[in-house]
């Protein structure tokens, strides 16, 4: 942990804030574990200890100009819900006046995220980028998205709404969407190891992601949410490959209407595409996703691996 400040700040009066030019930390590791009783590994304070307030101390006032963390790693595991999350290669920096009760915090963040739920992998080293101005109300513990730009791998997203810390957990009221409707957005969400360079890929058609999350995140609940993923009559062609993928239709919804995680369901109303004369169609519904998933699917069509390798840059 590095601290940058003028030596004269050590001699400020009791009513003067201590001006800190910057705080930074590198190569840190945070390991958080909740056992089956919901007790965290950092909860080590003695419950029966009582502190005596003599009324003589005053809170320390800090005026921090900027802070930065580089190459941090966060591991989270909940033994009861079997949720495991790893945030790796976390780089984050922010600037703002932390002496104010309300401030605009200018932030830049990058990370790679992996997520497993009950031994099922949902995300693996997904690259996240977020440049955002957050309106912070320290008195209400409320964080509001103002100007922001996010990338999931190469999929752009914009957020609107707020997150607020409350006694029972965190209250969410967020909306998000893709700022543009290009089908290249869909290729952008695929990990770069499987999608290759997108700079010269020719695409037609649209692709949009629109959704919201609203409600309480706590030990027993998640915010209710709805995510619509839609594409109509799209196509793409990589410049170094002879074939293209055409007539792409995607109509998918990921929905939670109760706030109970296991009630989340996926409705794939339509997935279809064509490579040469090979046409593929699929429909599916997936429920009970965090326990013993129930899948109802109908698949019809032809997938010729030789044609697929001529249209999509992946070794089969």
Model-derived regions, located:
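Sequence/structural signature of outer-membrane beta-barrel proteins
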Residues: 76, 114-116, 234-237
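Transmembrane beta-strand segments that form the barrel wall of outer-membrane beta-barrel proteins
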Residues: 142-149, 266-271
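Secondary-structure transition motifs
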Residues: 1-100, 159, 163-167, 171-196, ...
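Outer-membrane beta-barrel proteins
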Residues: 7-12, 213-218, 256-259
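Extended hydrophobic secondary-structure segments that form protein cores and membrane-embedded regions
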Residues: 21-25, 67, 226-231, 269-271
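Amphipathic hydrophobic-ligand
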Residues: 1-5, 80-93, 121-131, 149-161, ...
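Transmembrane beta-strands of outer-membrane beta-barrel proteins
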Residues: 108, 146-148, 160, 175-177, ...
């Amino acid at each position: 942990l590095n601290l940058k400040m003028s030596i004269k700040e050590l001699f400020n009066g009791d009513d003067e804030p201590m001006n800190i030019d910057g705080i930074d930390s590198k190569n840190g590791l945070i390991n958080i574990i909740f056992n089956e009783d919901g007790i965290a590994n950092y909860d080590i304070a003695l419950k029966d200890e009582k502190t005596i307030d003599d009324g003589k101390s005053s809170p320390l006032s800090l005026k921090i100009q900027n802070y930065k963390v580089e190459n941090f790693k966060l591991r989270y595991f909940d033994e009861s819900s079997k949720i495991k999350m790893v945030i790796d290669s976390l780089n984050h920096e922010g600037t703002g006046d932390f002496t104010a009760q309300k401030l605009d915090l200018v932030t830049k963040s990058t990370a790679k995220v992996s997520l497993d739920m009950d031994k099922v992998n949902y995300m693996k080293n997904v690259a996240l980028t977020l440049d955002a101005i957050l309106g912070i109300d320290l008195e209400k513990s409320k964080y509001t998205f103002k100007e922001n730009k996010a990338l999931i791998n190469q999929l752009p997203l914009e957020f609107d709404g707020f997150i607020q810390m409350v006694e029972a957990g965190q209250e969410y009221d967020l909306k998000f969407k893709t700022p543009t409707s290009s089908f290249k957005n869909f290729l952008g969400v695929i990990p770069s190891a499987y999608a290759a360079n997108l700079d010269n890929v020719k695409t037609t058609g649209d692709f949009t992601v629109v959704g919201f999350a609203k409600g309480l995140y706590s030990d027993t609940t998640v915010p209710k949410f709805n995510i619509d993923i839609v594409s109509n009559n799209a196509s793409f062609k990589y410049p170094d490959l002879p074939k293209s993928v055409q007539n792409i239709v995607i109509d998918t919804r990921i929905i939670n209407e109760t706030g109970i995680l296991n009630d989340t369901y996926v409705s794939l109303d339509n997935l279809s595409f064509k490579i040469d004369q090979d046409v593929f169609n699929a429909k599916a519904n997936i429920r009970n996703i965090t326990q013993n998933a129930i899948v109802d699917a109908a698949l019809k069509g032809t997938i010729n691996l030789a044609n697929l390798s001529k249209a999509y840059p992946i070794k089969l």
